[in-house]
Design a protein with these regions (language model features):
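Alpha-helical scaffold within the catalytic cores of cyclic-nucleotide enzymes
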Residues: 55-71, 87-128, 153-154, 159-162, ...
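Cytosolic regulatory/linker segments at or just downstream of nucleotide-handling modules
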Residues: 164-222
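A short glycine-enriched loop-to-beta-strand structural element that forms part of the catalytic core
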Residues: 83-84, 122-138
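Helical mechanochemical/support elements of P-loop NTPase systems and associated helical scaffolds
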Residues: 51, 58, 77, 94, ...
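Regulatory cytosolic signal-relay segments
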Residues: 1-27, 192
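Short, surface-exposed loop/helix-turn segments at secondary-structure junctions
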Residues: 140-152, 185-193
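Acidic/histidine metal-binding catalytic segments
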Residues: 77-78, 118-127, 170-176
């Protein structure tokens, strides 16, 4: 008899694969990406062991903002985070919660950045990107390290918006703007007026997208 993976018979291999493969569901949600600006300079100047507690403090502030605003952290890696809002289908698609989380991240990280600048002579800030749309919720990874994550074009666009955002800025797409429907002040009181920016062309994507930003209060070259 021909053996399948790991010496299993073909039938047994199929059964094991089916057991391991969790169901995938689709939903509409708002995806948030955030990353640390100035991280490369930090990592170059400081010993690696000194960077660890700084990243832990940074990611802790981001996770607190996500959880406080009703979202869920799906991925942390290095100096960045991916979170989802409205993934469970409660309270709409999560646009207002995601915007509130982005605003909270900027607000809560500001004193941390000031302290790092004072104590370590390091300039740092956060960039945030938001996009609302359909996502697939699934479990990925080897059997010993599986994790629930979000997949799809919505995730890719949110990540690209985060990369495009300037330090201290929240960028979001037209789908987020439409979902807010003028309720942005209720979602995150104290936000400065939104600015509509020129269309953003994403490499590999057929059409550009309309984008808005919550501008940075202070322009930083990071």
């Amino acid at each position: 008899m021909t053996e399948g993976p790991c010496g299993l018979s073909p039938t047994a291999a199929i059964i094991v694969t089916r057991v391991r493969r969790a169901p995938v569901r689709t939903t509409r949600a708002t995806v948030l990406f955030a990353d640390l600006r100035g991280y490369m300079g930090m990592a170059e100047r400081l010993p690696a062991a000194r960077v660890v507690p700084l990243l832990d403090e940074f990611l802790g502030a981001l996770a607190f903002a996500v959880e406080t605003c009703g979202g869920r952290v799906f991925h942390m890696a290095g100096d960045g985070m991916m979170a989802g809002f409205g993934v469970d289908g409660e309270g709409g698609h999560g646009a207002s919660q995601a915007l509130a989380a982005g605003h909270t991240m900027l607000r809560d990280f500001s004193p941390i950045a000031a302290r790092w600048r004072s104590e370590l002579s390091i300039d740092s800030a956060i960039g945030v990107g938001l996009h609302e749309g359909e996502v697939a919720v699934g479990v990925l990874g080897p059997s010993h390290h599986r994790a629930t994550t979000l997949v799809g074009d919505t995730v890719n666009v949110a990540a690209r918006l985060c990369s495009r955002a300037r330090a201290g800025e929240v960028l979001f797409s037209s789908t987020v703007a439409a979902a807010l429907d003028g309720n942005e002040s209720a979602a995150a009181p104290g936000l400065p007026p939104f600015l509509q920016l020129p269309q953003f062309e994403l490499r590999g994507r057929r059409s550009p997208i309309d984008i808005w930003c919550v501008p940075a209060l202070e322009r930083l070259a990071l």
